[in-house]
Curated annotation (Swiss-Prot):
Source organism of this protein record: Pectobacterium atrosepticum (strain SCRI 1043 / ATCC BAA-672) (Erwinia carotovora subsp. atroseptica)
Pathway: Metabolic intermediate biosynthesis; chorismate biosynthesis; chorismate from D-erythrose 4-phosphate and phosphoenolpyruvate: step 5/7
Catalytic activity: shikimate + ATP = 3-phosphoshikimate + ADP + H(+)
Xref: Gene3D superfamilies: P-loop containing nucleotide triphosphate hydrolases
Lineage per the UniProt record: Bacteria, Pseudomonadati, Pseudomonadota, Gammaproteobacteria, Enterobacterales
Similarity field: Belongs to the shikimate kinase family.
Protein name, UniProt field: Shikimate kinase 1
EC number: 2.7.1.71
This protein's record includes keyword Disulfide bond: no
Length: 173
């Protein structure tokens, strides 16, 4: 990869976007950003608090602005929030400004990876987590697929293995 293209990671919560993104950025000597962490940095509050105070719509507005700004940079790896693809504007920007990698995973793996994580506002509800994740998958998976240049399943692989797969796919294209 001679030129430094932007790499944008999309996929559901628990797919490994942040972990794999950090690994990928380190291996490629690129700058790493996580849209949720960037929102937390700018607001001085965690994502759950922003959700509670501003609602999902307020959070998505912030997310859209942050992703717009970050995707204007060059040579970055960006881990997006799982719901960021709900915005057509965000989908268009991701597609136009870099390579979109869809990190795909099963509901079972999502449950295992998120069960103790209290920073998942959409799972902090009365509805059983499996039902929430299934509903989100039905709504969002087609949107991830719509903009993906590359799709990689992350279920039984380490972050380093997935990062290497992404690098190999990018180099062969």
């Amino acid at each position: 990869m001679a030129e430094k293209r932007n790499i944008f990671l999309v996929g559901p919560m628990g797919a490994g976007k942040s972990t794999i993104g950090r690994q990928l950025a380190q291996q490629l000597n690129m700058e790493f950003f996580d849209s949720d962490q960037e929102i937390e940095r700018r607001t001085g509050a965690d994502v759950g608090w922003v959700f509670d105070v501003e609602g999902e719509e307020g959070f998505r507005d912030r997310e859209e602005k942050v992703i717009n700004e970050l995707t204007e940079k060059q040579g970055i790896v960006l881990a997006t929030g799982g719901g960021s693809v709900k915005s057509r504007e965000t989908r268009n920007r991701l597609s136009a400004r870099g390579v979109v990698v869809y990190l795909e995973t099963t509901i079972e793996k999502q449950l295992a990876r998120t069960q103790r994580d209290k920073k998942r506002p959409l799972l902090q509800v009365e509805t059983p987590p499996r039902e929430v994740l299934e509903a989100l998958a039905k709504e969002r998976n087609p949107l991830y697929e719509e903009i993906a240049d590359v799709t990689i399943r992350t279920d039984e692989q380490s972050a380093k293995v997935v990062a290497n797969q992404i690098i190999n796919m990018l180099e062969s294209n």
